[in-house]
């Protein structure tokens, strides 16, 4: 295990990811992201669970000496197995509070393959950025085409005027961790 990185790291990245599937490639991707965030001396903020991709991203960050901040609503403490190894574990009353704290504590967002909860977090952060609440990078890592259907639908909304080009430009889509971290890095 590496020495702990100073908790006052210059940069904090929220990772939105799955809490259910255990596909090897998903867990490997999440672990790669967690290790890469820690390797840069950045802080990881994530959903606070110790299952699926959430557990993999946080465990890998800590294994590489990174500082981890988990944010979990009390209704999910047992369902998502709250990660009591987190350097800081924040238990909220609601999902909304979880998302707000994660957004407030982060300088950038990485979205990994996930389901409805991941999409909820993505759309919240993306909408807030589009509306000018923040100017933080929002980066979707999609190495296997998990989000192809979503992206096709969004492009259809763009083509018909329901989504603006400016909004689409706020969402960066990459297929590897190196490019994701580059897109998240401070300018």
Curated annotation (Swiss-Prot):
Spans through the membrane: none
EC number: 3.2.2.n1
Effect of residue 98 to A: Loss of catalytic activity
Catalytic activity of the protein: N(6)-(dimethylallyl)adenosine 5'-phosphate + H2O = N(6)-dimethylallyladenine + D-ribose 5-phosphate; 9-ribosyl-trans-zeatin 5'-phosphate + H2O = trans-zeatin + D-ribose 5-phosphate
Isomerase listed as a keyword: no
Biological processes per GO annotation: cytokinin biosynthetic process
Binding site for substrate: 80, 98-99, 115-121, 127
Gene3D superfamilies linked: 3.40.50.450
Cellular component per GO, a single term: cytosol
Enzyme class: hydrolase
Family according to the record: Belongs to the LOG family.
Complex and partners: Homodimer.
Name of the molecule in the record: Cytokinin riboside 5'-monophosphate phosphoribohydrolase
Name of encoding gene: log
